[in-house]
Amino acid sequence: MRFMDTTIDLRCAKRNMLIIILVIAASLLVNISANAQNAEQWKTLEGDVNLFIANDLGRNGYYEQKPVAELMGEMAGAIGPEAIVAAGDVHHFEGVASTQDHLWMTNYELIYAHPELMMTWLPVLGNHEYRGNTQAVLDYRNISRRWEMEGRFYTKVYDDNGVSIRLVLIDTTPLIDRYHHSATYPDVDSQDIDTQLKWIDKTLDEAKEDWVIVVGHHPMYADTKKDIIEQKDMQSRLLPIFQRHKSKVAMYVCGHIHNFQHIRRGNDGIDYVVNTSGSLARKVNPTDGTVFCSPAEGFSVVSASKNQLNLYMIDNKGNVIHKIERFKK
């Protein structure tokens, strides 16, 4: 009869287990060190007033949505933003049916669950929200304390350490003709375009803050395979207003195209920024006026001091891949 040497087997098992534990411990130490290093680097982005901008999110956590959400939470811990500006399409693909739609959990609550993301969110409507019940998107502020959407278009001022930023948050889908008279976008036709445009003009006219940023979902300028008529409609309705207030408007920031683009056109001095998707990005090529473009997923960080406004484009690894700087003259 053959007997196995169990003593040797136990020694081997213990040794293997020790190796595994040491490897795991070393990996954790590397991750902790890397996170600490990242936090120190991210801290340098902080200004007197800080904001995150994220959009084109709702993929039920798939693709890069969950990793980017976790990254946002980690960076928020280092930078301490006052709010997260959600520049449309928090929900793909057909919007939401009600405030109780399960998509609120799978697209938003369970994804952006990091403790540092339990702060004010300032959303605007995107074209995908308009495929569903847009009033439910507004009414969700009665369900979630962090969903501070005051209207289809509204303004918000942040003032800290003597530095002020005015956000002018607008509803761009009704400004584009192709969304009208369509059963796919049932709430568009009931929106009063003229009322919104007059409100934007008046709000910019009365703005006295150090910095003014206009945020909408659709781009004024962009490289895209989408119908160029979208940009032409935006330009015909908004550019005259922006031109009247070009001394005040620092940036127009949007989403919709699912990549990063920084564009300067004409002599109005405004930076036109396309913020990428926080879940699934698309290819991009330079176009007329392109300063920078990238197909990376991610989000943007805005930081302001009295004399300087910065927008940092952050990829899905937490790297700053482009910086827009504006200075007070």
Whereabouts are the PLM-identified features?
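Active-site flanking residues adjacent to catalytic metal/cofactor-binding acidic residues
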Residues: 55-56, 88-89, 170, 216, ...
